[in-house]
Amino acid sequence: RNELRGEIQQSIILAEKQLDDRFAIKVLKALFLVKYFGNFKTTKRNISVLMIDDINVDLKAHETKIDTALTILENQSYVQRNGDIFEFLTDDEKDVEEEIKNTDIDEQAITQLLKEILFDEIIRDNKIKYLENKQDYDFTSKIDGSFFGREKELEIEIITDNYQDYENEAFIQSQTMGSTGMKLVLASNATFMRDVRMYIKTAKYEMQNRGSGTRPQVARILQEKSMQNVTRKKNLILMANKALGESKVYLNGGKLEMTTSNDGKTKVINAFQKLVAVVYP
């Protein structure tokens, strides 16, 4: 325990030397104080409440300061974020976090994870029933221009902000003209894409560094990272489901006017009805 206390003190001392934002250091100290209180969830809102020291505080300005402080602390690996939970990092945890962030991953791994989340976890089917004739129709699954499995006549492509032409909405729309596919464009979400990358980096780092030669402290951190990644994946699925339900749909050269849905699969099924009607009039 004394060793851990010393390590934490070193983290605080280092932060005081390296950070110019004095409020960020205060937030870091508060996160240290609640690090081992399992019943206190360190969400942005709870941290914001914890840091109020004046009943007349301007809440909007205060929350902006909290936002800025947490961004600084996360970017410099003094804290880690998993979903909406922020956690103080000890020296060893900080070292591992920085090594994870510096782990190289390729674009194919990102596209593969997006496919697993959107098609395998949310849509879950490789056929969708057309309600007019009760017939099931196969479709090709595509993410950001990459297709998976054998190509079928009908095509469902999901576009994320990882796509090279994401900003060119007119181009995406024009690609559907005269085609037998539809495109669902997710709203830009930097947090989602950052968490996708962190999930892949964490899994790769943990796999590369597990083994009998690992120091006990690092082995413990790796085990915690692995458990946190399970939670991260669940959060990614929730975020993706919401984004898919709110996505823009393009088919046959036009934008399909549809109501948003709380459920991504429902949105896809409803849009698919329109696609089948256009392709097989």
Language model features by range: what are they?
Residues 1-281:
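Extended alpha-helical scaffold and adjacent linker segments that couple domains
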